[in-house]
Amino acid sequence: MRRTALPLLAVLLLSACGSGSAATGGKLEVIAAAYPFAWLAQQVGGPDVVVTDLVKAGAEPHDVELTPRQVGAVQRAAVVVHLKGFQPAVDDVLQGGGQGYDLGAVVGQLPDKDPHVWLDPVRMQAAATGLADRLAAKDPKHAAGYRARAKAVATALGALDTTFTTALTGCARRDIVTSHSAFGYLADRYNLVQRGISGLTPDAEPSPRRVAEVAKFAKATGVTTIFFESLVDPKVARTVAAEIGAKTAVLDPVEGVTGDDDYLSVQRRNAQALHTALGCA
């Protein structure tokens, strides 16, 4: 992954002129390191916060590079919603600061270093509650609003959890093959077995041996669909699918959305895609 490289003087100047500013027009400044965090912050913060997403819509967030202006915004923010280890450039800026709200530390992470904790609706419920507490500590005047909205989003996430549970009942298979290993939390929550063609890095090129291993696994387990992601080249997934006579379909890690989509709508499509691919009742 690439890391942010800024002249030392620029960083020092940004820090000096920007530290401590926590509100804009009476609203709390919240920086989100990627779309899922921005969605959560907006749902919980509502009209009492200004949320800025560091990643442009439709862009791949893993290798985000920060401009000097973004570095200053991170340093000024009251709260920065992020996931330690997911985006090294963001981690670098947050070192030594107390404004970071690390989802991984709040909800607990699996041991395989998969950063996609937000794909588990139950963990996102805990993240919403914790974020409300953090915002309330920074802005006690609006504490009741933060906690009420966190309760509402937790209810919506509970409904999403039910959607997945229902969709994945009575399935002919529990094995999924994905273009990269982004779905560990989803698999863990709903008792699926994930096999990623690539590892945790979405743009990593798998070796021919790895492709052959995954194809063998897919044949042995009766996999009929190879999943790829909307932000990743589907070439390798299509190669494996062609080799075993399978179909391809999108399974979205919700790293970014376009149009009228949001976290909930994309996740509901994921549930339907899995339901179809796994031959569920």
Locate the predicted segments by residue.
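Hydrophobic core
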Residues: 12-14
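Extracytoplasmic metal-acquisition and chelation regions
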Residues: 4-7, 16-281
